[in-house]
Amino acid sequence: MIIRRLTNEEIPQACELARGVYEIAIRRNFPGGESHAFFDEYTDEERLCTEAAQGQLFMWGACEGNMLVGVCAMTIQGHITMLYVHPLHVKKGIGKKLLRKARIFARMELKLQQVSVNAVPAYTAGYFRKAGFT
């Protein structure tokens, strides 16, 4: 398993993974609602590529061989905006490794003291607490 920064060329693949996980884990279980429209708008590949090219957004991927199995995105302000792991690869510590990589980058490269996240849906709050978020 390799955790590394994604290139702009890989952002569409990261969005595809995020959309697939969202469909399975969230949209099917929580039909309707504004959060779906927000997610659909947020995962606009062109916008994400532009933000990444401008240095406003950073993305990491967890790769097993040639397959992207997890993705994490963080803004230049240190806010985690995306954390998705393929359902066949959960419970392997991939999310924690992605978060750790983002936190180290925030501290070392962006010189930030803390990283933030909004746990959506709410049932993910326990996961983020265990990962050190308050």
Residue ranges and their predicted role:
Residues I2-L17, R27:
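A short beta-loop-alpha structural element at the N-terminal edge
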Residues R19-R47:
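Conserved GNAT-fold acetyl-CoA-binding loop/helix
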Residues A106-V120:
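Conserved GNAT acetyl-CoA-binding A-motif
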